[in-house]
Amino acid sequence: MPKARASQPYVDDKLKKEFSLPNLPPTSESKVKPNSTAKTFSPPSQSTFAAVVNFLSNPLAALQGKQDSMAGFQYPGVNLPLNTSDRFRFDELPPVYPIGMPQARGTTSMILPIREVAMMLIMEKLTDKPNWHEKVFDEAIVQKWREEARTQSENGLYSRIMEGKTHWNEIPVPQSRIISEEVFEFCIAELRNKAPYFVKTGLIPTLDSDGNAIVKSDNLMSAELRHELKQAFETLRADQAGNVDWHPGTNDMVQNLVHPSMYPFVYNRSSFILEEQVNKENALDFVGKGELVPEITRLADFGGRFINVCWRPEDRGTVPPEYRSSHYQWLPANVSFREDGSAEFTSYINNLHPGKYPAIYKAIEHAIDTAIPAWDQCLKEDIKYDKKVTAGRNESRFEFISDADDDDEDLWTKSMRYKWPREFRYNYFNFGKRTQPSRGETIIPGKWVEGRDAILPEPKKFEEIDYTPPQSIQEKFKEHGLQVIVKMASIELTPEKPHFPAGSWHVEGQMNERICATALFYLDSENVTDSHLSFRMQTSAWLSDSISTGQDNYNWLERVFGTRLGHGGSCIQNYGDVKTCEGRVLAFPNVYQHRVSSFRLKDETKPGHRRFLALWLVDPHERIVSTANVPPQQRDWWTEVSKAAEGSQTEIPGSLMTVEEAQEHRVKLMHERSRYEEKAEHNMERQSYNFCEH
């Protein structure tokens, strides 16, 4: 079994005095023998606090790699403070794969010009074409694309770029083409650069800019793997036919086959074993063994330190408590690597019986093998505050604008008359009379007005990019292994329920889970319309520190970037959409907010479905509580084994939950996460640019 990666803590005297940590026995005393018949499930032991402090009192020198390992196992929320990552100053930051909390470390994108977003959208569409990697070298086909880009209306393109921006109607539509000749030629050059890499790897980095990328592939999932996974779905659906688990709040349209919100780790309820002894072969032997971990009533106070997560002057940089849960945590399964480099589960997948479904375990192991190259492609490692390791594009396609002022006539076309299009009056915006910021005229849709137009910058000269990842998580974390959270779900539509609504913007998990990347396997779609995942990111609120402009003279910049830069201009960047078609693998880092689009039945007289496997990668830099620590909590699993075993004990261990209790915890967990998502969305929306404050 892979060793747990020991987190290196910083604990000062104030923490030791003010924060009460759970009392857990030393490593040597916490071992539980699988064959033991003693009932060891008990409340927290009363071993001395000094034993825990011994885990926590390592010097900061350990953070620089001077101490590679520690005796024992350490987990945030157990024998480390739940908010242990808050302890670092900027000069102490350890490596992480960022998590997309509002204004979090490593999760902000540089603001992109509308032309760059348009380029990303155009290239995303072109790489969906069959044999795009060959067509992009065919001059006749490219000329046809060029003519389409030159003549087609850009209204839809512009509205997608500006979608969700509450003040975008105050920014005039560019009168010049967004897709200029230079922009189009850059796109073709970039696609020709990506084509050989796609042929070699099957991977397409898409919607990529400045160190952030999404990865799609329609041939990464082999026919054999797809067959294995489809068989897994059919097996589970058949076994659960008499007791279908419809996800709460989905109007009985989302069937959970495996979901981490059922039987999660529950503080002060779940049995816990400090050392990672519960594996998939002996998991049920540990039922009833272990200790409770008390609910966390107060987070550690690290004082006014600059921390590694986020910094907002109004709250000293502390993370809002809603971002972490002191009640629940999803349970990942531990994954090690065999000698040949392939993935192997060393602990059970929560809610997937390890004895009943060995073939499904094998299939998901193969899916992890498939996902790792895509994760390597899209993960960005933050080594230090100003040092990052990433694959592919790591800078904008446009020169950074450091100085721009509306009084500079070279930034504008000469005065001209143009018509404000009627087609921008969408029913989800309240269009009426609008004011053009640069001139102050009243603009009425469909009327001719007089004004000047911003000259949009052209992209830099194209330079080839090496998309090869500089490192692989399989090699980097070979000794410690990975932790992966698994979800298997089927969206079922019927003539009575023909429409699936769009989802909400979110990142995956809370900070407890430390999810750093997602891999989605779209296995099977029948009689449903196309669906997409939409992506967006937060941008830095401190843009005014980098761009010099006069007082309130930033209207040209607003037109270039397609956003308000004064009060109320949210620091949110739309990246675009990726189709979630059958047979596709989609991977992305957990720095993007994303949401699923709505879809419906094609033929509303027949049922339809969309089925997918989700793999969520826990940041391997920091170990969290997993199924290697928590014996199975499903009472029915134990009951089946107990009945089959001759002379088995009849008393039900107190650590087990009924389905009804697990469902109650799921509802509470979902309610807690809804509050977190609302808080995160509020914090993201309230971050605004401050160009008006000079």
Task: Mark where each language-model region is.
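Fe(II)/2-oxoglutarate oxygenase catalytic core
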Residues: 2-5, 9-25, 33, 39-585, ...
